């Protein structure tokens, strides 16, 4: 299209450049510029043919770029001139936004997304007085960047520090409910997700750094947690509960909006980033409370998706499994080695929430063969059996005995050997007997999930069958074939695990038979696991599968008679 078709626009651009060179503080000079800019901007809305002509002209984009560049001169503005200045910058960016809806290739080629960010940062610099228009300028920049990058995504890492500055601007900014908030969040989250899709950006964003400067982590925490993640927490505040001595996310109370879904998509992309584990470890040290809440959200995201690929599964396990290792080998044994008076209740709440989130993530991902192989290769069976043993020796077994209805008439509290607990301080720290709930100090539901994971690992895996027995895990599984309100349905999970441990494994069957002879094993547990004790002529004892016919001499019954 001939240049004279853009005559009005080019004259406007020339006027802006001339004003910025001569006297950017002259309020009167802005008046005709703002008026003409508004008229031309409206034409980009109403005249589709003209809008497309401008959008497809590289020359027009270059002139628009040069004009916005001219607005970034290091000239100090007073309060009166800052308002029309900001309005002019916003008008140019809104024009760019409308054109980018038609053409993304040219503005990306010219790296205009970088210029938009620079334009906003200049408007918030010491050269420009802060005005209420800044917030509207930011939303204009977001929507412009949204349009530029909706089909083409280019991240210029040379501008990474400026990009972080731009992304952290909303920290502490109050948005009006309704249209303003919606216009902010969707493009903001889209942009952040776009940047996270760039491996170079995401790895640099979450990368650990040895610098003692708090600003390095502060800006990242502000963007990822205080802005993005906090939006979900704020919207779902009724789902994040700290009650009955526990801290957890009740997903039955979630009411996910389109904005919340975008937040979760950003988090989903983040948790598979190679450097995410280092960021997570650092966040736990800097802000333990935020770490716990974030881990609960990670648990929700990971367990809600069914199609993780191998790379993503490895990335998730690379941060989740080390947390479990540390808890199992260090933090939890240390917790039980201390007196009840040596720690605050919040310590147990933090430990329990962190452990349960990690266990639940791993248990859910065990449906993938890749994760099972990962766990076996990293000696997880030894760690899980050791943790189960720690819990077995230290947790109280609790039974809420109810009469008619849901009223608890009596609470039975014993140790792992069935001995009644008399220590009133210990009971107080573990159970609220007045309201009949179990505190985090007794790590409710944790043994249950450990056994679920072990069942996944041992299924059709003879080496793991033997390893669990050799580590003492078979005895632990047997001893949990009981009803325990600290771990509802642990009996059923233990029976499933026991079935997998015994299947086609003579040594495990022999071990169980010896335990049964000592009245350690409950017959109903064996029965539900698909086995039964068979006493034959001469007093010989066999543990046989209920699927086999013990009277059939040709059936493949494994004899476990003692010599």
UniProtKB/Swiss-Prot annotation:
Keywords: Cell cycle, Cell division, Cytoplasm, Phosphoprotein
Modified residues (Phosphoserine): 559
InterPro entries cross-referenced by the UniProt entry: ARM-like, ARM-type_fold, Ataxin-10/CTR86_families, Ataxin-10_domain
Alphabetical GO biological process terms: cell division; regulation of cytokinesis
UniProt subcellular location: Cytoplasm
Positions of post-translational Phosphothreonine modification: 433
Chain residue ranges for the region called Disordered: 544-563
A single cellular component GO annotation: nucleus
Family classification: Belongs to the ataxin-10 family.
Note from the entry: Present with 8970 molecules/cell in log phase SD medium.
Function: May play a role in the regulation of cytokinesis.
Protein name, UniProt field: Ataxin-10 homolog
Organism: Saccharomyces cerevisiae (strain ATCC 204508 / S288c) (Baker's yeast)
């Amino acid at each position: 299209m001939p240049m004279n078709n853009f005559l009005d626009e080019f004259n406007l651009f020339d006027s802006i450049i001339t004003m910025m060179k001569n006297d950017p503080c002259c309020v009167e000079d802005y008046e005709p510029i703002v008026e003409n800019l508004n008229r031309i901007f409206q034409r980009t809305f109403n005249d589709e043919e003209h809008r497309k002509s401008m959008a497809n002209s590289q020359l027009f984009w270059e002139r628009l770029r040069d004009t916005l560049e001219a607005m970034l001169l290091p000239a100090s503005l007073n309060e009166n001139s800052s308002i029309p200045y900001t309005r002019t910058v916003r008008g140019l960016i809104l024009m760019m936004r409308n054109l980018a809806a038609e053409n993304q290739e040219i503005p990306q080629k010219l790296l205009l997304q970088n210029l938009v960010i620079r334009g906003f940062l200049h408007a918030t610099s010491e050269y420009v007085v802060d005005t209420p228009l800044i917030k509207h300028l930011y939303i204009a920049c977001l929507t412009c960047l949204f349009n530029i990058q909706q089909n083409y995504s280019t991240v210029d890492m040379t501008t990474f520090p400026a990009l972080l500055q731009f992304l952290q601007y909303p920290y502490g900014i109050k948005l009006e409910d309704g249209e303003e908030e919606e216009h902010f969040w969707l493009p903001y989250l889209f942009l952040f997700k776009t940047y996270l899709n760039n491996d170079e950006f995401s790895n640099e964003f979450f990368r650990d750094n040895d610098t003692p400067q708090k600003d390095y982590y502060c800006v990242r925490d502000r963007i990822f947690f205080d802005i993005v993640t906090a939006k979900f927490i704020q919207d779902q505040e009724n789902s994040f509960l700290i009650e009955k001595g526990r801290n957890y996310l009740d997903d039955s109370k979630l009411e996910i909006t389109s904005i919340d879904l975008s937040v979760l998509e950003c988090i989903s992309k983040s948790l598979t980033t190679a450097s995410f584990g280092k960021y997570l470890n650092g966040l736990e040290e800097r802000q333990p409370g935020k770490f716990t809440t974030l881990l609960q959200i990670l648990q929700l995201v990971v367990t809600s998706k069914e199609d993780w690929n191998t790379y993503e599964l490895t990335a998730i396990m690379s941060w989740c499994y080390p947390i479990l290792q540390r808890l199992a080998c260090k933090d939890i044994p240390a917790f039980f080695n201390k007196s009840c008076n040596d720690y605050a209740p919040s310590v147990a709440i933090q430990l329990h929430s962190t452990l349960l989130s990690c266990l639940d993530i791993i248990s859910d991902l065990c449906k993938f063969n890749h994760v099972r192989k990962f766990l076996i290769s990293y000696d997880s069976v030894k760690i899980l059996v050791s943790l189960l043993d720690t819990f077995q020796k230290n947790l109280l077994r609790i039974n809420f005995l109810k009469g008619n209805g849901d009223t608890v008439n009596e609470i039975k509290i014993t140790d792992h050997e069935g001995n009644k607990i008399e220590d009133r301080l210990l009971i107080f720290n573990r159970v609220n007997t007045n309201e009949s709930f179990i505190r985090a100090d007794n790590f409710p539901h944790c043994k249950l999930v450990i056994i679920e994971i072990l069942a996944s690992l041992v299924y059709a895996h003879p080496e793991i069958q033997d390893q669990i027995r050799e580590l003492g895990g078979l005895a632990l599984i047997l001893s949990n074939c009981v009803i325990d309100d600290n771990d509802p349905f642990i009996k059923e999970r233990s029976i499933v695990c026991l079935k997998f441990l015994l299947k086609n494994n003579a040594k495990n069957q022999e071990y169980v038979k010896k335990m049964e002879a000592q009245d350690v094993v409950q017959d109903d547990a064996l029965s539900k696991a698909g086995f039964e004790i068979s006493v034959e002529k001469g007093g010989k004892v066999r543990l046989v599968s209920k699927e086999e016919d013990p009277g059939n001499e040709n059936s493949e019954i494994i004899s476990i008679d003692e010599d």
